[in-house]
Amino acid sequence: MALLQPARIRILAIGKLKRAWVAEGVAFYRKRLPGLEVVELKDSTPAKEAEAIRAARKPAERLVLLSEEGRQLSSVGLAELLGGWASERLALVIGGADGHDPTLKQQADVLLSLSELTFPHELARLMLVEQLYRASTILQGGPYHRS
């Protein structure tokens, strides 16, 4: 299984981080994932957010939307999925409060869900960067993840 390459991954996130503790948590994991890029896009209607996501996405990026109806994976399953995509560029997209526009969902390569629970998008961003770090350590055989 190939190692995770954070420089090939971009998180496209609707909205800014407003809570300092969330921003600190995201920064903590980003330091451990050199090259991981986070692009913040303006809150709007789902249709306008979809336009902004399409404009921000690079042509060669696989479009992965985080969505409540997406596929749920274990941390090991996510690591395996990301390891299989190690040579590809990824755009992991966190939508706004009203979710993703249906047309964007149709264009997505994959829909993933962090949980059956609903989270504020700020918290989803923190959980996503932590899971990316966890996936990286799983693929490297590091001690962070305990099965």
UniProtKB/Swiss-Prot annotation:
Keywords: Cytoplasm, Methyltransferase, rRNA processing, S-adenosyl-L-methionine, Transferase. It catalyses: pseudouridine(1915) in 23S rRNA + S-adenosyl-L-methionine = N(3)-methylpseudouridine(1915) in 23S rRNA + S-adenosyl-L-homocysteine + H(+). The keyword Metal-binding does not apply. One of its GO terms (cellular component) is cytoplasm. Pfam families: SPOUT_MTase (PF02590). Belongs to the RNA methyltransferase RlmH family. This is Ribosomal RNA large subunit methyltransferase H. It comes from Synechococcus sp. (strain RCC307).
